[in-house]
């Protein structure tokens, strides 16, 4: 079995979840297949219930952090069943010095939209959801 040569650290440890290092500088567009809940181990080592998104194009999933969840809700609404079939553009960003997967936007929105992300004990941040993968 021929394997591809890894070019990013994230590729050394493949797993169930999409990792930002696998994007190789691109912004992939993926179609949401399903949104579910799962018990995942958090950074603190404790099990937490988190949203997990499955996609049509890959068996890899995206664990849903609050920032990405707020962006998806702004684009697609509160009813999760209505997210199925929607396309989402992902990109690699930095968070606490580490690569992180973020939502760039969706070709299913009609124009760029501003989203304010308010997290507990943090200053609100402004994000823009884009219609295309290009900046």
Model-derived regions: residue spans:
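Short beta-rich binding modules
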Residues: 1-135
């Amino acid at each position: 079995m021929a394997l591809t040569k890894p070019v990013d650290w994230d590729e050394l440890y493949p797993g169930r979840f999409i990792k930002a290092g696998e994007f190789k500088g691109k912004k992939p567009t993926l179609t949401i297949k399903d949104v579910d809940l799962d018990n995942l181990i958090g950074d603190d080592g404790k099990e937490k219930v988190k949203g997990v998104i499955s996609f049509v194009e890959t068996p890899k999933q995206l664990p849903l952090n609050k920032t990405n969840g707020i962006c998806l809700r702004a684009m697609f609404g509160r009813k999760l069943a209505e997210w199925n079939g929607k396309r989402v553009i992902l990109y690699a960003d930095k968070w606490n010095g580490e690569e992180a997967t973020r939502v760039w936007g969706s070709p299913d929105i009609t124009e760029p939209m501003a989203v304010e992300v308010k997290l507990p004990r943090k200053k609100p941040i402004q994000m823009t959801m884009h219609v295309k993968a290009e900046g």
